[in-house]
């Protein structure tokens, strides 16, 4: 049985695709759950929805999953500028959920993450993470009494959600893949050392990675003042053990890195996008140095059985465009795809 930790309310009001973070005219309820996955694995799941509303149709429920390094709660529910991505959607009438897979944030961390990395093998593979998503989807569908929900993944999360959707089309309404992972033109060096159970990142390294590929004259105004520190403070706080190190670090499972070596860097797809048979949106930004545009383009061409598909490329954005100055462009495209009526081919001949 899932355990409900607590529930709180916060205020938000919307106007079109805009928002007012300080307004209290409309309420948002937030609940946190512990959801079982594989034996011994407990997942942290968070939900936000309009206060007092308990019934949602399949088309108004969305689940987020994070990428390879940072947890979902500080990716999708960090109130930069006064409102998080979850807040913005909940204020529009959505029942929005996130899940942190094993090894991240408040979900169960494998025991080897409490030892030096070299003493263990890479933990949290894409297959394991997909089972965690499956557990979260089943929990949400049972709780809401629906057969399908919408899914969105970021970075490695696109592989998790893509793999899940390709094998569970009947449970997916629409699919959003933000910075999709696909076959890389890079390869694994022949002298690459074996991977440990997990890796660590520092605050300085995180900022350097964020800005990689950004023109020097564009760096200063890419991330609004205070947003990086707000995000970094919240993100590194999700790993109390790492925070005790000097300097403080964030621990991240290496299963994703091992899968990259075994599949994406070896020219072998981990799954086939052609098996996805639900409407799909790809979101990507031009300065994404982690998963460059060529991967999105190649992935888009593989979506041969989606009823309809769309690819939106954002200018002046990185792998983390969702937390940058152009985040409302991102939100506009996300909400537009999720809320539009299913496009149909017109029978009228063009004039």
Task: Annotate the PLM regions.
Residues 26-57:
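N-terminal cap/lid segment of alpha/beta-hydrolase-fold proteins
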Residues 147-185:
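Conserved hydrolase catalytic core segment
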Residues 128-148:
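Conserved acidic catalytic loop of the alpha/beta-hydrolase fold
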Residues 289-295:
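Conserved alpha/beta-hydrolase "acid-adjacent" motif
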Residues 317-328:
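Catalytic histidine-centered segment of alpha/beta-hydrolase-like enzymes
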Residues 186-281:
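Alpha/beta-hydrolase
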């Amino acid at each position: 049985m899932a355990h409900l930790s607590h529930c709180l309310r916060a205020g938000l009001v919307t106007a079109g695709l805009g928002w007012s973070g300080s307004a209290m005219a409309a309420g948002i309820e937030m609940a946190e759950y512990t959801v079982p996955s594989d034996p011994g694995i407990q997942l942290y799941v968070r939900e936000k929805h309009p206060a007092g509303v308990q019934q949602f149709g399949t088309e108004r429920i969305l689940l987020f999953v994070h990428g390879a390094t940072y947890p979902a709660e500080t990716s999708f529910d960090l109130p930069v500028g006064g409102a998080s991505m979850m807040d913005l959607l909940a204020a529009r009438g959505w029942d929005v959920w996130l899940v942190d897979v094993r090894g991240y944030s408040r979900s169960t961390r494998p025991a080897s993450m409490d030892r030096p990395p070299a003493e263990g093998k890479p933990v949290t593979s894409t297959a394991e993470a997909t089972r965690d998503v499956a557990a979260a989807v089943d929990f949400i569908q049972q709780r809401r009494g629906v057969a399908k929900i919408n899914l969105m993944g970021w970075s490695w999360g696109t592989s998790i959600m893509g793999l899940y959707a390709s094998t569970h089309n009947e449970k997916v309404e629409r699919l959003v893949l933000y910075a999709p992972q696909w076959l890389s033109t890079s390869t694994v060096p022949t002298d690459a050392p074996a991977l440990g159970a997990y890796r660590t990142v520092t605050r300085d390294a995180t900022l350097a990675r964020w800005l990689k590929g950004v023109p020097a004259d564009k760096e200063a105004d890419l991330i609004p003042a205070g947003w990086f520190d707000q995000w970094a403070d919240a993100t590194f706080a999700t790993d109390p053990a790492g925070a005790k190190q000097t300097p403080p670090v964030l621990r991240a499972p290496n299963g994703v890195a091992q899968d990259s070596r075994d599949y994406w860097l070896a020219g072998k797809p981990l799954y086939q996008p052609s098996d996805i048979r639900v409407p799909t949106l790809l979101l990507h930004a031009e300065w994404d140095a982690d998963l460059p545009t060529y991967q999105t383009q190649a992935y888009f061409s593989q979506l041969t059985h989606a009823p309809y598909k769309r690819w939106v490329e954002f200018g002046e954005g990185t792998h983390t465009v969702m937390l940058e100055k152009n985040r409302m462009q991102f939100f506009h495209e996300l909400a537009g795809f999720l809320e539009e009526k299913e496009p149909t081919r017109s029978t009228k001949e063009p004039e």
